[in-house]
Design a protein with these regions (language model features):
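Alpha4 helix (beta4-alpha4-beta5 surface) of REC/receiver domains from two-component response regulators
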Residues: 69, 90-106
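Hydrophobic/aromatic residues positioned on beta-strands within the core alpha/beta folds
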Residues: 86-87
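Short amphipathic alpha-helix used as the core "switch/output" element in two-component signaling
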Residues: 46, 68-80
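C-terminal output helix
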Residues: 94-95, 112-122
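The feature encodes the CheY-like receiver
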Residues: 21, 63
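Acidic, metal-coordinating helix/loop segments flanking the phosphotransfer/catalytic sites
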Residues: 37-55
Length: 146
């Protein structure tokens, strides 16, 4: 499964590690998607007010703003924006539930193969398409959960 619908091809990546952000941009662009990366969560509000994206990929641990607070802020700013957590925290049940309560639609550990993130993105996008067609939404998509 892949997020191949061109309607959902714009990704926003928010990760304080420039290497990971660059890797994700390269990986997704190689699959035909467009991407923009921010390495500072504080840039998110101004970027989202001027640009569109179909999915945000958010790290949880960042120095200037934590991912949970950022997810809550993004959810207030755009209630329908799909948000997927991509984190080095690993499978931490407390962090995962905090992210989901804040409004994340998916959760993937960075220690899993990158294909897991791509599968979660595909499922989250499929769920969003269902919502647009007024079909009841599915549960959050998790990767790395025991």
């Amino acid at each position: 499964m892949s997020p191949s619908n061109r309607e959902y091809s714009q990704f926003l990546i928010i990760d304080d590690d420039p290497g990971i952000a660059k890797f994700l941009v390269t990986y997704l662009r190689q699959r035909g998607h467009t991407c923009h990366a921010l390495t500072d969560g504080f840039q998110t509000a101004s970027w989202l007010s001027e640009h569109d994206c179909e999915v945000a990929i958010v790290d949880l641990r960042m120095p200037k703003v934590d991912g949970i607070s950022l997810i809550s802020f993004m959810r207030e700013m755009n209630p329908s924006l799909p948000i997927v957590v991509f984190t080095g925290v690993g499978y931490d049940e407390e962090q995962m539930h905090a992210a989901l309560r804040a409004g994340a639609n998916g959760y993937v550990s960075k220690n899993l193969p990158i294909e897991q993130l791509y599968c979660v993105l595909a499922r989250v996008l499929a769920t969003c398409q269902q919502r647009k067609r007024s079909v009841p939404s599915a549960q959050p998509v998790l990767a790395g959960a025991a």
